[in-house]
Amino acid sequence: IIFNWDWYAGDIMHMLNVREGGLAIHGGLLLGIGVGLILCYVWKVRPFNILDLCAPAIALAQSIGRWGNYFNSEAHGGPTDLPWGVWINGQTYHPTFLYESIWCFILFLILLYVDNHRKFEGQTILIYGILYSCERFCVEALRTDSLMLGPLKQAQVISLVIILVCVILYVILNKKRGANKI
């Protein structure tokens, strides 16, 4: 929506038409976290505790959800001769959905461990943000259907911003943990 504002500005309700696609994980995560933060404020609960609780489930849901890209024959990489390439319309392509699905499942396992051994509130969600965004930056380089933002793909730019924000928050919250032990 942000990158096609001129198209959406004339018909705001068109933004809600999910049947036409255009859904992206970064937008979904930002909306979900935004709504979650509002609910935390309303319910007077500590947001990083809730985000930490949700992080492993988000990674698992992404691992499963990426298979939708396979069934829709979308969000794949460029042509490949690798034996695990997926066959779409007479050509084999990098199965970027599979790369991301496998990584998100591994991330799910990592986050379960981190959450059970976390040192401060926010550690689990911040590690999710860093590791998922690193993976997404790399896999995005293989995809052929991405929006560009200068020399990088839009999702790569967003991933870099998320990594930067999460690393800064990680350092800040980790320094505060001495005063605020869990």
Regions found by a protein language model. Give the residues of each.
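A feature for loop-to-transmembrane-helix boundaries and adjacent hydrophobic helices
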Residues: 1-182
